[in-house]
């Protein structure tokens, strides 16, 4: 940001608010995407989000990170994100008969018949779905799938898959939800549980195990004079800068170099002007375009950085030119 100090500081809080939160959520969501190993992951987190705007931005950030869609209808309307949803436990409980609840739901939502089958007993409910399916088929309604939301999901999925297959519903998919995060997703995928897709809520939309990101916005130059903080534990590098990214011969990320603006380094420059005098220099990219770019960049992470635990830190280097500038600034302040 290059601007008079009052203007630069007027936008500081909102820029930090948007970047901190969505970067944090997108990072958490990307870990779930990697753990799911190609199986769709859906945002179910609005009810546990820290406020309405946070829920909407979490839906956006998770979609950018690779989620298949969201259960937040307003996010779908605002951002063009695919909307997913099933039925509620309350709908089942409002009926005196579980099978009747399933049938009424199918009649009301004939194009999205995904039954929530854990209100009482999953295996019993799965058999009710099998018994109901021929009657629905006679009315051109197909069972799209079932959702499991509690208990030992791997064990329940195997038992339910067996019941559905024996009942002729081999095409019905199993969606799993219930306190999922990247670690549980990884365990379920590694166990080869017959689960086709996942819904992730609380852990993602609150980034429960890493609920903050200490991103900062600091003055680096004033009236052409480079400057920096030297506060203990909070020192910054001075001057306008550029970041260059280098890849391995195999196309994977190798390292970044942070340097002064005019110190050309090997690799691709990452910082580009987006606005001038308050006007965008180009149209904002479409959300799906951003999502594709994120997928490309995630695919370039080396295996050592794709691990859920004991992940290797990315190599970020400070150029000699930037170190020399910092020394010069320190001598004069």
Model-based region annotation:
Residues 1-167, 183-184:
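Buried, small/hydrophobic-residue-enriched core segments of structured protein domains
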Residues 162-167, 172, 180-333:
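Gly/Ser/Thr/Ala-enriched C-terminal appendages of enzymes
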Residues 86, 116-118, 148-151, 175-177, ...:
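Generic beta-strand/beta-sheet core signal
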